[in-house]
């Protein structure tokens, strides 16, 4: 990979990993509501699911030409529906002001999110088909870059969770407003899938 292509790869992957999306918003919300330690299950579920999805993207990227457009469209609708459901859960979740201690979303729920998270699917397919496959079609490289993509995505999730933890006091003071803003950002993510 040339230095120019490598810099484009890093720019694309880091910007995509650090911008708002379902995982980052969920990580921020969970750490704000429950603290970083209690959010580690959420982050672990995301990370494992992310890795598996990136490996699946590697396989998909190899056979991109034969993907049924109807299946991709169906996946987009399923992803949008799940993201809207997640937005509803965040918008209606109790805050500390409400005097309730809701538990964070489970490992398995955050794991399952990855399989309908269109942002990471597109992230994986785009990175692999744009930066890797034109350079090499060696399976070891494709798998290696898939693992790297999952690590970069996990880094973004942890950064957002740490921000939620570090600004917890401020976010708790304005918990209801924050939850509504985060929910609206998720709805925006769902809408952006189609437009």
Curated annotation (Swiss-Prot):
Residues 1-9, 68-69, 126-141, 195 are periplasmic. Its main location: membrane. The chain crosses the membrane at residues 10-32, 47-67, 70-90, 105-125, 142-162, 177-194. Keywords: Amino-acid transport, Cell inner membrane, Cell membrane, Membrane, Transmembrane, Transmembrane helix, Transport. It is found in: Cell inner membrane. Residues 33-46, 91-104, 163-176 are cytoplasmic. GO terms for biological process: cysteine export across plasma membrane. It catalyses: O-acetyl-L-serine(in) = O-acetyl-L-serine(out); L-cysteine(in) = L-cysteine(out). GO terms for cellular component: plasma membrane. InterPro entries: LeuE-type. It holds the Pfam family LysE. It is a multi-pass membrane protein. It comes from the Bacteria. One of its GO terms (molecular function) is amino acid transmembrane transporter activity. Exporter of O-acetylserine (OAS) and cysteine. NCBIfam families: PRK10323.1. Belongs to the Rht family. This is Cysteine/O-acetylserine efflux protein. It comes from Shigella flexneri.
């Amino acid at each position: 990979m040339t230095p120019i292509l490598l810099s484009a790869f890093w720019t694309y992957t880091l910007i995509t990993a650090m911008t708002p999306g379902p995982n980052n918003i969920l990580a921020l919300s969970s750490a704000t509501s429950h603290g970083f330690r209690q959010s580690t299950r959420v982050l672990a579920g995301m990370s494992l699911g992310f890795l598996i999805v990136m490996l699946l993207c590697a396989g998909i990227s190899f056979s991109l030409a034969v993907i049924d457009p109807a299946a991709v469209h169906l996946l987009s609708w399923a992803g949008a529906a799940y993201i809207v459901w997640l937005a509803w859960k965040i918008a209606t979740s109790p805050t500390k002001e409400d005097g309730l201690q809701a538990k964070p979303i489970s490992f398995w729920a955050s794991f399952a999110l990855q399989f309908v998270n269109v942002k990471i699917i597109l992230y994986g397919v785009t990175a692999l088909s744009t930066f890797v496959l034109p350079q090499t079609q060696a399976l070891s490289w494709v798998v290696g870059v898939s693992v790297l993509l999952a690590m970069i995505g996990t880094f973004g999730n942890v950064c957002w969770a740490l921000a939620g933890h570090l600004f917890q006091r401020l976010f708790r003071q304005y918990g209801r407003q924050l939850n509504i803003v985060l929910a609206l950002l998720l709805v925006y993510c769902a809408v952006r899938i189609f437009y």
